[in-house]
Regions:
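Membrane-interface extramembranous regions at the lipid-water interface
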Residues: 1-29, 71-86, 105-132
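Hydrophobic alpha-helical transmembrane segments in multi-pass membrane proteins
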Residues: 18-45, 53-75, 85-108
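Binding-site signature for planar aromatic cofactors or substrates
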Residues: 50
Length: 132
């Protein structure tokens, strides 16, 4: 699975390891990218401060949208790995209880060991062995 499919497609399954690695990477990477783009914006020295401010807001919105979309896709894929509907993402809108439930289900519990209705196991379990 390519990194764009991993981060921006809600289809398929991912294992816990990949879920945590991507969550940590994007939690660090998106703010770093945001501040790097803002620094670049400051170095360009646009003529109007209003234009600079508008571009800064647009950069912030794009970074935020990227973060949220990738978060949704990663969590939906973890629900799929647990053989549950991606609509369970909506449980995050229940304060505290929904957050804890999602953390335990998606971040701590193992996925379905073999193929399920959302695809084959990301660990390769339950598949035919192929010699060549």
């Amino acid at each position: 699975m390519s990194w764009t499919d991993m981060l921006f497609s809600p289809y398929g399954r991912i294992r816990r390891r990949d879920f945590w690695l991507w969550m940590i990477a994007k939690t660090i990477g998106v703010p770093v990218l945001f501040f790097a783009l803002l620094l670049l914006l400051k170095l360009i020295h646009l003529k109007s401060p209003d234009t600079e401010q508008l571009i800064g807001v647009i950069i912030m919105m794009v970074c935020w949208a990227t973060f949220v979309l990738s978060n949704i896709c990663l969590i939906v894929k973890r629900w799929h790995d647990r053989n549950k509907s991606g609509w369970l993402y909506l449980i995050l809108f229940i304060p505290v209880l929904g957050w804890i439930w999602t953390l335990v289900e998606c971040g701590c519990l193992d996925g379905t060991p073999a193929r399920n209705r959302y695809g084959k196991s990301p660990k390769g379990l339950g598949e035919e062995a192929r010699a060549f």
